[in-house]
Amino acid sequence: FAEEKSVKTNWKVDEKKRIENVSPETRIETFLEMDKDLTSQGINVASRMFSFGTSLTEKYFINTEGSIISSDVPRIGAYGFITVVENGKPEQAYKQFGYAGGWEALDQWKLTEQMINEAKVLQRVIKEAKAVKPGKMDLVCGSEVAGIAAHESCGHPMEADRILGREMSQAGKSFVYPGGPFWLGTRIGSPAVTIVDDPTVKNSYGYYEYDDEGIRARPRYLYKNGVINEFLHNRETAAK
């Protein structure tokens, strides 16, 4: 394993509104009210599906090198899936939300406003959207598309165990591999593009301060100004 300093600490994510203090009745009523507001906009939202869940992850990490780390992370997640139908034509939208913290997440998400906006967009798409002529063109991508591309096409290929072949039979290999045309320092994109894996963003769903090997979290610049900059390592791959 790569050498790391031992650490003794405990950390947690605070809740401004404790999830455990919110009754099941309040949780259900919150989403029933959202559904009521959504269906009173004069838009034919033919189907709606909402899901909501909470968790509290408590971890106690200890290793033979002297590290002792305890943590408590409450998380809250929700998603909405709606179908709008106009003149017999359906369009669908899916919105997902995640937060490390307490019930205050719902105040920040503004679920009702976001789902109503999605319904209005779908209605407009059905009524006004025009087919695009085939061909090459410049596109401006929204966060939904850009996020998927960053995660799937940029994030997974930078996993060092995948790069070294450990994931090949289960989840596929990477376009980056030893002896290949792409490696650290190789330019593969525009200087305007930098992609960062950052688990230290406060209240993000994937937030953590120390990982499951006891390593302090930090932003990792996978691609910097269009250049392959660093990989996602565990202690085993970091030692190679």
Over which residues does each language-model region extend?
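Active-site bordering "gate/hinge" segments
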Residues: 1-219, 224-227
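C-terminal, non-catalytic macromolecule-binding modules
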Residues: 227-240
